[in-house]
Amino acid sequence: MLPAKMVTTAFELPGYRVSANLGVVRGITVRSRSLVGNFFGGLQSLFGGNITIYTSLCERARSETYAEMCQHAQALGADAVIGMRYDATEVMTGLTEVLCYGTAVKLEPLAGREPNP
């Protein structure tokens, strides 16, 4: 997987210049909660606050899509992903699509500057 420092929501990386744009890369997953999970999530919502069952589901979905996006970038020979974003859409009741996307790029160190580690 690409090092975390080489994936950014910014459109540039300090100490580097983009030498080639390899295109959009993405990871996608569609998730649903089990009937039991929905029941306990519903109970938690009665008391307010953080709904931990859904929080952990969302975090797993984001982690999976991030890893898939990074694998896609590596398959293209990318050095980094810039402009990374997440998006989530309810496909139908109980099913949520999570998308992680960005632009895969090749980088060159800037002349006379040490790249930011």
Curated annotation (Swiss-Prot):
InterPro entries hit by this protein: UPF0145_dom_sf, UPF0145_YbjQ-like
SUPFAM superfamilies: YbjQ-like
Family note: Belongs to the UPF0145 family.
Protein name: UPF0145 protein CV_4322
